Amino acid sequence: MKTLLKSIKITLVFCVFFSVFYILVLWLFAQVAGPNRGNAEVVTLNGKVVGAANVGQTFTEEKYFWGRPSCAGDGYDATSSAGSNKGPTNPEYLAEVEARIDTFLIHHPYLARKDVPAEMVTASASGLDPDITPQSAYVQVKRVAQARGMNVEEVRRVVDKAVEKPLLGIFGTEKVNVLKLNIALEELKNR
């Protein structure tokens, strides 16, 4: 009986610790040391809030760069953040990826099938990725330039400026925030 009571006490202590104290410590750390004090990085255009830089969103128009596909609810639904949990040998998953490749190639007819970046046709684990690799941005430059009536080199320069380097030059990889990139294009248009 003593062992059972000890087990219950330890379980309760750990439940309180991990469900209250630990979360509180993480929240306080984010408030002190986190980017934007642990809050969303709100992005505005012409004084209007258009999104959060740290949560992906869907762009489907030809004049915008597109992010990764999302399996989070009805597309980039932060309340349903999750991957599809389908493995690479799942026939349903393979069919989804093939359909995404076909769709991507329809909008990028200048690409060969082998040149489609894998991240542009596969969803991330969270389903909320706001960033793509520079390669994924560069393969879209021609489409975006044509849709906007801009010079390809001009759009490429916007992408070049949008590339974020790894933290301290060693942590992570180069990335491009899709929302910030599209905002930069809109601001360029408004000049």
From Swiss-Prot:
Keywords: ATP-binding, Cell inner membrane, Cell membrane, Ion transport, Membrane, Nucleotide-binding, Potassium, Potassium transport, Transmembrane, Transmembrane helix, Transport
Membrane-protein topology: Single-pass membrane protein
Cross-referenced Pfam families: KdpC
Domain of life per record: Bacteria
GO CC terms: plasma membrane
Localization in the cell: Cell inner membrane
InterPro entries found in the cross-reference section: KdpC
Gene Ontology molecular function terms on file: ATP binding; P-type potassium transmembrane transporter activity
Residue stretches spanning the membrane: 10-30
PANTHER family for the chain: POTASSIUM-TRANSPORTING ATPASE C CHAIN, POTASSIUM-TRANSPORTING ATPASE KDPC SUBUNIT
Quaternary state and interactors: The system is composed of three essential subunits: KdpA, KdpB and KdpC.
Similarity-based family: Belongs to the KdpC family.
HAMAP family named in the record: KdpC
Role played: Part of the high-affinity ATP-driven potassium transport (or Kdp) system, which catalyzes the hydrolysis of ATP coupled with the electrogenic transport of potassium into the cytoplasm. This subunit acts as a catalytic chaperone that increases the ATP-binding affinity of the ATP-hydrolyzing subunit KdpB by the formation of a transient KdpB/KdpC/ATP ternary complex.
The protein, known as: Potassium-transporting ATPase KdpC subunit
Species in which this protein is naturally found: Bacteroides fragilis (strain ATCC 25285 / DSM 2151 / CCUG 4856 / JCM 11019 / LMG 10263 / NCTC 9343 / Onslow / VPI 2553 / EN-2)
